[in-house]
Structures are given as C-alpha cells and as structure tokens.
Design a protein with these regions (language model features):
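Active-site neighborhoods and metal-handling regions in enzymes and metal-associated proteins
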Residues: 1-139
Length: 139
C-alpha cells in the first residue's frame, strides 16, 4: 500500500512545486510522529506546511481534502486514522500510512504514500521514500 506520483513527460513548475510541498509535508508528519502524540496532532502538522504555502486552510482546496494517513494492519486501511479529532496516541508497535495527497482542482493531484512504524526510540520509515519527481521509484 504505497503510492508514487510521476509525470508523463517533463514536470512543469507548478507540478514540481506541489511535489516538493508534498515531500515536505511527509517529512513534517514523520517528525511530528512521537510516542504519545495524538493522530489529530500529526494531521495538524501536515496542515501547518500547507498553510505556509497558502494552500488549504484545513480541508479546503487547493490542499489536502482528506486524512493524512491511516493505521495499517491485517485489513491494510484501519483504525486509527491520522485525521483531526482522532485523539489516539501513538504507541510502540503502531504502523500507519503517511499519505498527504495535495489536490489542485481541475489540474492534478500529487500523493506520496509511505509507512511509519513506532519503536521505543520513536518513528522509523517502513518503506523507501520517493527520491524526486523525475525518479519517484528510486531506480
């Protein structure tokens, strides 16, 4: 359950900018993912980056119209959800997606989805991150 966005042809300036913002949001989510931090607070961390670039605010477009991520288990998409109002604290052993899709209405959307698991030392990446818009699969 990972997602990569790539461009057929060459990315224009707006596509490149939004891809880089998406990457910045992913890193902000990872950095906010500390033990005992609530899922709601992690979603808030993604929206702080959006607002820095005059996207959103909140769940408005252009921006991130849905949750930042979800728990991962036997059903792939499951509780808890990385969304405003989910007060579940992160605990050792939890695994969740980090997938803050940015939508630019009538133009395009960009989503990079990776996974984080929580250890006693804090968050660890479970998947290999996309390298760049030109090489999203790190080939």
């Amino acid at each position: 359950d990972i997602t990569r966005t790539y461009i057929f042809g060459e990315a224009d300036a707006l596509q490149r900018k939004i891809w880089n913002i998406e990457k910045e949001i992913q890193l902000a989510v990872f950095n906010a993912s500390n033990l005992n931090t609530t899922c709601s607070a992690i979603d808030d961390a993604s929206r702080v980056v959006l607002e820095k670039y005059n996207l959103g605010p909140d769940y408005k477009l252009p921006g991130l119209p849905h949750r930042t991520g979800h728990g991962i288990g036997l059903d792939i998409h499951e509780y808890p959800y990385i969304i405003r109002g989910d007060m579940t604290p992160l605990e050792v052993g939890m695994t969740f997606s980090n997938e803050p899709m940015i939508c630019v209405p009538n133009k395009f959307g960009i989503r990079l989805e990776d996974h984080i698991f929580m250890t006693a030392e804090g968050p660890k990446w479970f998947t290999q991150l996309a390298h760049s818009i030109e090489n999203p699969f790190n080939l």
